[in-house]
């Protein structure tokens, strides 16, 4: 059995179809093409717990008022069934062809436990954050920002490294932050970087740190990441849909938005980020 159409790979589009039994690209097929064939997408940054808050988000709130430690989102999470909300987000992920999702999971160990009975055929990477005096839940650390957690960040990174986990940190999302402090922590990736300077990006590239950008979510607050500069520098980039209350977890929606807002970035480059995002990070020894 064959799917007919050019196959998107790390080296761009190749062949005229895909033989399904052995997943081999073929160069010659009779008849018209059915479309294009792309790998499953990677959604490299989500907050799925607030998905069902989408129709309830108040207008006019600032970033800190909406998602800060004492913001509206956390009050909503405390008064609603987060597990049901996560399932709604996972449904969007599964039905939009996403094979990997990385969720920053609020709520400490209890927050991570909401995924225990989730059925997802792809790869699920959960990055936890502690509640109150709790230690790091799970193996991976999803840090909101250095401004939020302060010196606790060092301990969270240490715990994740002891467990051979990943470390991701929100940075320069709504205003410029000192990149030197976050580089010293040696995270695997940073999220957002909307207000990063050229020097910041060059420092991140030199440090071998990856970046996940969430353009649709950022645009809600009037921000956009300097994606074109990141691409020019050859930074290892991933796309994320961020908060479910602001954006669908559908990567096709993210791709369309990026294509619309960043016309200087080649479409095949956009597809490559969507399909093979954070390749360098995942393939590190």
Predicted regions and their residues:
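C-terminal helical cap
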Residues: 4-10, 86-93, 210, 215-220, ...
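A conserved glycine-rich beta-strand in the N-terminal activation segment of trypsin-fold
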Residues: 12-21
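Structural signature of the urease/amidohydrolase superfamily beta/alpha-barrel
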Residues: 23, 237-241, 256, 275-285
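Active-site gating loops and adjacent loop-to-helix segments of metal-dependent hydrolytic enzymes
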Residues: 51-84, 175, 180-185, 207-210, ...
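Short, hinge-like loop/turn segments at secondary-structure boundaries
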Residues: 60, 119-121, 185-187, 230-232, ...
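Active-site loop-helix segments enriched in His/Asp/Glu that coordinate
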Residues: 75-155
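Active-site core of metal-dependent hydrolases
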Residues: 134-245, 264
């Amino acid at each position: 059995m064959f799917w007919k159409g050019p196959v998107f790979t790390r080296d761009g589009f190749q062949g005229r179809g895909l033989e399904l039994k052995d997943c081999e690209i073929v160069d010659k097929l009779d008849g018209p093409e059915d479309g294009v064939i792309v790998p499953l997408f990677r959604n490299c940054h989500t907050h799925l717990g607030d998905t069902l808050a989408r129709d309830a988000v108040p207008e006019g709130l600032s970033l800190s008022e909406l998602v800060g430690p004492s913001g509206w989102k956390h009050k909503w999470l405390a008064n609603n069934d987060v597990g049901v909300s996560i399932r709604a987000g996972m449904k969007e992920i599964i039905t939009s062809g996403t094979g990997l999702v990385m969720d920053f999971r609020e709520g400490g160990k209890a927050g991570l436990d909401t995924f225990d009975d989730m059925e997802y055929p792809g790869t699920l990477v959960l990055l936890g954050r502690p509640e109150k005096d709790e230690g790091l839940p799970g193996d991976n650390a999803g840090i909101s920002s250095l401004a939020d957690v302060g010196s606790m960040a060092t301990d969270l990174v240490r715990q994740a490294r002891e467990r051979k986990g990943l470390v991701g940190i929100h940075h320069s999302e709504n205003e410029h932050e000192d990149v030197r402090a976050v580089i010293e922590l040696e995270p695997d990736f940073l999220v957002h970087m909307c207000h990063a300077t050229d020097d910041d990006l060059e420092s991140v590239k030199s440090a071998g740190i990856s970046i996940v950008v969430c353009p649709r979510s950022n645009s809600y607050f009037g921000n956009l990441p300097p994606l074109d500069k990141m691409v020019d520098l050859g930074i290892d980039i991933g796309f994320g849909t961020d908060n479910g209350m602001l954006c669908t977890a559908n990567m096709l929606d993210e791709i369309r938005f990026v294509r619309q807002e960043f016309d200087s970035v080649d479409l095949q480059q956009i597809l490559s980020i969507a399909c093979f995002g954070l390749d360098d990070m995942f393939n590190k020894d």
